[in-house]
Amino acid sequence: MLFRQVINEDLGCASYLVGDIASGQAAVVDPQWDIAPYLEAARGRGMRITHILETHTHADHVSGRGRLHEATGATMHVSPLADAQFPHEPLDDGAVIDLGTVRLEAMHLPGHRPEHTGLLLIDTSRGAEPWAVLTGDSLFVGDIGRPDLAVDAADGAREQFSSIQRLMELPDWVEVYPGHIGGSLCGSAEISAKTSSTIGYERAHSALTRSDDVRAFTAELISRLAVKPPDLDRVVGMNNGPLVTPGAPAPALDGEEFLRRAQAGGVVIDGRSSAAFAAAHVPGSLSVPSAGSGFATRAALVAGRDDPLLLVGSDEAQARDMGERLAAVGRRDIIGVLAGGFSAYLDEGL
C-alpha cells in the first residue's frame, strides 16, 4: 500500500496520495495547487493516478484538481451537494472506490460545508475495518473545522456536532489525517501543527470531541472563530467552476517600468526580510516577508481584493516563488515581478 501525506507549509494544508502498489492504481485526495509531489511520487512507484477526490469545495486555497486531471486524465469525485460545474462522479455517503486491495469509503460529514465528506481507508488484504480516516475540515488535531464559511455559523456548528459524534463512533485505533494543520484559517488557534492523531487520542484530549451538549459545543466553536480566508467567494467560485490551469507567467520588469505600473495602481508586495525592507524599498510598497509559512494569506489580506499585484524579492527567483504561492490562494492578477531582484533596482539608481 502507498500512503503519502503532502503538506503545504505556507497554507497549513494537507493532502494525500493513496494507492495499491500491486495494481498500480492511486488516488489523490484534496490536491493542492502544486501537483508535482503527487506526479513524482506516483511515477517513482510506477503507479497511475486514476482518481481525484475532493472532501469539499475549498475556501482558502485553489485546488490543483484541474491541473492534475489535465496531467493524468483521472476521474474526479465530489459530493453531489457541492455546486461543482465540472465533470465528476458523485461522492455520496457510503460510496466506495477500490484501488486493488485499498478501499476508500465516503463518510458524509457536514458542518464545515454542507457537502463535506471524509474518507475511511481500508486495507482489504488485512481486514474489513478502517485503519485511518481522512477527516478533511471536520476534525483536526486538537481542533474542529470552522462552521461559518458556507452557512450561518450556528447552523454549521450544529451540523459539525453531529459529524464529530459520528467520527467518535470509530474505534480508538483509527488514525486521523486532517485536511489542515496549524497556520490554517479553516481552524482556530487550537489547531495543532501535528500532522496526525488517532480517534482515541482526540476523544480523550479534546473537550469538543467529548461534548454531548450541542448548545455548549456550538457556543464554544463559534467563540473560536477568527478572520475568514481572504477572497473567499472568488476562491470558492474558482474551485466550483471549470478546470483551473496556470495563467501566463508574470513579466519581469525593469525598475522604470515597475515604478510606472505601481504609480498606475499596482500594489507592490515586497517579500524580503523586514530588515532589508527597512533599509531600502520601492516607494509605497508593502512589506510581507515570504520566509516561513502564511505568506500568501498575509499578502492577500493586506492587498486590495481587485488590485493588480507587483512583486519584489531579493532576487527574481524569490519573486517568482511568491507568485506561485499567491496563485494558490486565487491571485491571478500579478502584473509583474522586479527583474533581477531588488539589487538590480538599486543598480538602476531609481
Residues covered by each model-derived region:
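Active-site metal-binding motif and surrounding structural segment of the metallo-beta-lactamase
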Residues: 33-77
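Conserved beta-strand hairpin/beta-sheet module of binuclear metal-dependent hydrolase folds
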Residues: 1-48, 119-136, 142
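Core dinuclear metal-dependent hydrolase active-site scaffold
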Residues: 3-6, 16-17, 96-128, 251-257
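Rhodanese-like catalytic fold shared by cysteine-dependent sulfurtransferases
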Residues: 146, 200-248, 266-267, 274-350
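Divalent metal-coordination and catalytic microenvironments
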Residues: 18, 30, 56, 68, ...
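Divalent-metal (often Zn2+) His-rich catalytic cores of metallo-beta-lactamase-fold enzymes
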Residues: 126-127, 132, 142, 154-247
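Active-site environment of divalent metal-dependent phosphoester hydrolases
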Residues: 34-36, 57-62, 83-86, 114-115, ...
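Active-site neighborhood of phospho(di)ester-bond hydrolases with catalytic His/Asp-centered motifs
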Residues: 28-29, 48-58, 77-81, 108-111, ...
